Design a protein with these regions (language model features):
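Core segments of cupin and vicinal oxygen chelate
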Residues: 11-58
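Active-site beta-strand termini and strand-to-loop segments that position acidic
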Residues: 50-54, 122-125, 135
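Short, P/G- and charge-enriched loop/turn segments at secondary-structure junctions
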Residues: 36-38, 71-77
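A short acidic/small-residue loop/turn micro-motif
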Residues: 66, 114-115, 135-139
């Protein structure tokens, strides 16, 4: 018998939750669905957040306990995230690309992968790769 799983929600360990919220909200259109209490008096200094867009959920978590973090991200840690890719099903890959470019987000030119998916990629502030893809020719 299988386990009746209904969904999966990635949790990304990030350097600065408010900075990541701003990226996913402003660049991609996610809404903040839930947050932890702020770590400090700054009302947006959350350690955890749940984001939603069209039924897609994504969690962000501060990679440092009690918001004690260095002044700059650890570049080795950011580089280690480069092998993590989140794939989003997106019918209009060209439209997503145009929207990202218009918002000043560096995105790869859409192309069809050898396995038939049209894709464009971006990298978030913590080095995680995001792919927007759809089967080529099936819009």
């Amino acid at each position: 018998m299988s386990i009746p799983i209904e969904s999966a929600v990635p949790l990304l360990a990030v350097f600065d939750v408010p900075r990541s919220i701003a990226f996913y909200r402003d660049a991609l259109g996610f809404e903040v669905a839930n947050t932890s209490k702020p770590f400090t008096d700054a009302q947006d200094d959350y350690g955890w957040a749940m984001l939603r867009l069209n039924g897609v959920e994504l969690m962000l978590n501060n990679m440092y306990e009690d918001n004690i973090r260095p002044s700059e991200p650890d570049q080795a840690r950011v580089a280690a995230h480069a092998d993590t890719i989140i794939y989003f099903a997106c019918r209009d890959v060209d439209g997503a690309y145009a929207t990202l470019i218009a918002k000043g987000i560096a995105a790869s030119q859409p192309k069809v992968a050898y396995y038939g998916m049209k894709q464009t990629y971006v990298t978030d502030p913590d080095g995680y790769k995001l792919c927007f893809q759809w089967p080529a020719g099936s819009n």
